[in-house]
Each structure stands twice: as structure tokens, then as C-alpha cells.
Amino acid sequence: MYFVLGDITKMDTDAIVNAAASDLKPCDGICRAIFRAADTKKLMEACGKIGRGRIGEAVITPSCGLPCKYIVHAVGAGWYAGGRQADLLFADCYRHALQAAFLYHCKSVAVPLMFSGDFHLPRPKAIRIAGDVIRAFEKTHPGMEIFLVLYNKSIYEMAVKILAQTEENDHGHESVR
């Protein structure tokens, strides 16, 4: 996994991942940023053709004017209650988003830190979940480049620190590049 401090909407990868609501309409956070940067009308039409997404699953639309080829919409829900089930649900969102990109023959995917803002997943937990799922996916899909894109320096530094610590616990599996 590669860490990127920047704007996911500018990533020139095969796909970018969006943290989406089940109605696939623009919502706050990264979702709103993606809709604003894309041709909003075209993206809303593409999402409208799909209709709804199931929580924990992912659906794909064209990029609608962004540098990437596809937008993978990972459908989440609020973390308010927390617990193991919520953690598994968020892990499924990452897993299904990466799997969807793989099924579309994507060789590079930009993934944001999903659900830690408006969906209320605590940021350190969100970082660990993202790191665990991305590392596991890389083991079984070594040809795919996965970029964890973080929009703010403090979150970027937190992610590097937390995932470097879990890296040491994984006995040196290299994923922080």
C-alpha cells in the first residue's frame, strides 16, 4: 500500500473509491468532494441507473470526468453503536470495493480513509481496518497498486504511524512504501 497526502479526485488511477450512502446520492465528506469534482449531472445519472447499494457492498460507475476510469461506491452506514458487527461491516466495504475494482481489471486503486468523518467511525479504528483489509487484499492480488489517500497532514501522519506499528506486529510484512 502506498500513502498519498492529497486529493483523491485528482488521482490518475484506474479507479477511486467513494464512501457512499445507500441511495448513492451526494452526501457529506469525500462523497460530496467526488460529486463536485466530477460532472455532477452525469454521475448522478449513473448512480440513478443503479438505484441503491446494499450496505457493506460496492457498485461501480464511470468516472464522469475525473482522471480515473471508474468510481467504486462503497456503501456504508453510521458507526454510532460500534461493536464487532460494525467493524466487520466497514471491513466489508473496503474488501468489496477492492474486489469490484479487480473484477473491472483495475491495476491501480485510490482508496480514502472511509467512514471516519460523517459516518462516525473513530479515526484510529478506521485506519486499522483499512490497513488490515488492504494488506490482506494485496497478498492475494499482488498485481494491484493500492493508494491510501489522506486529505489532511495530521490524518496522513496518524495513518503512517498506526500502520507502521501494526506492520511491526505483522513481523515485517512490507506494505508501507
Regions found by a protein language model. Name each.
Residues 1-103:
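Glycine-/small-residue-enriched capping loops at alpha/beta junctions
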Residues 79-177:
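Phosphate/ribose-phosphate-bearing ligand recognition and processing surfaces
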